[in-house]
Amino acid sequence: MKEELSIDIIGLAGACSYALDCIEAEFVNIKNKHGKRVAYISICMAEYWKIQGDELQDLAMCALLHDNALTQYISEELKKDSVINCKKDLSEKKTNLHCIYGEKNITKIPFKTDVSNVILYHHEHADGTGPFQKKWNEIPLFARIIHLADTIDIIGNNSWNFICQYLLKNRDGLFDSECVNAFLHAFTHSESFMCLSDGSFETKLWEIIPRQKQVFDWKTCKNVADFFAKIVDY
């Protein structure tokens, strides 16, 4: 008899995201619930393209797990040098490795749609000045969405006017026009954006994302467990 297990895969991705939050807070001073905020911004932007169902769930999982290789990268760097500036090093030198490792790791997760190169290219800039010099039309849509959402959250500025000015200033530079338009379509005023600060976004996140338990064989379950182990074992 074939052994199988029923799993809420998106809920598990949320748990992995929490583990990543703890690690990012320790090493790179990223504020709490970063992955979930990136996921919330991403799925709100997705409405612009009418992304629904399996695609929306896979976008949310990619967003929740976009920094999945952080511990793997930091662990390797610490083996070389016990004193490193992780925040500076990640942002300036080794972003490409963080993306390469993350893309490889994510293949262990049972997505329903094709998410190839989403994690690999999630730090690319629309004008081709990112780590792999890919321009916006060479980058998967999900990667472009996550890149904008990730950047907005890392900025950490709650001023709606500042965010709008920043996006318009970097339109067709850091971000493509479609994604800028999608963000401004999703968050039309400061009140809609403020839920990211008051914590209410998390309830809204789980209300929007399609969730249901799926049945997986033991090999898939082991792959998922191995993925989680890479995050917490450092």
Regions found by a protein language model. Give the residues of each.
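Histidine- and acidic-residue-rich, metal-dependent catalytic cores
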Residues: K2-Y234
